[in-house]
């Protein structure tokens, strides 16, 4: 009888452990594990990126990246994106809210990536939005992007800090900041962002998830609704939405200039990707542009990413 009771207790324990394997409690908050891609976070209880964004969709979004005319054939791939994104899914990257919000954030982030790495033009096969991930670094840079006045992240002799990556990084101080963020020595080795696609995506996602200054939102925050504008923000016409992601990432290089080609190209990539992913551009969200927004960080104060 005692043996039978012990066996029953063992079976109950195994059953309870199995039920808890995917869901745990941390400080009274439900957290979940989804294997290697997402674990130990409440955001992991939602669908992960690979649940709703598959390799064939990545191929559709970046259909011409490996064409002979492209400048980084064979470099970018789906697995590199998923591997980099997985580092940030526990923080809510494309796991905040439901499936539609996750898909919209994938399209928004990759919309920036596609626009910033495109070699497309209006008459190109498939149109200008079909040529994202054509580059992994700036071609024929006109300068070395070395700011000798920066003592915290001084230029390394013989190293050039031209644009590299999925959302290109410029200038020595920015390579230093991003390198600290992803725990890579980019100040000494900025070339890593044009040699390793996973690191290139990781640097871009880190920028998406990280505020440029204290008490400011990240691009992720303004997109998913984590940010509540202050009175000063509303007076500056800054509101949550895709438009504010451009403000966070580029400031007055893109925003506050009315309707410009640079701004509209980024919006076009975002909406095109929404269509290809089956979400539809009608779900682009409010406050799509930043033409009237005052920059969070004017050029005189910005980090010049």
Please describe what each predicted stretch is:
Residues 21-305:
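Folded extracytoplasmic luminal domains of secretory or organellar precursors
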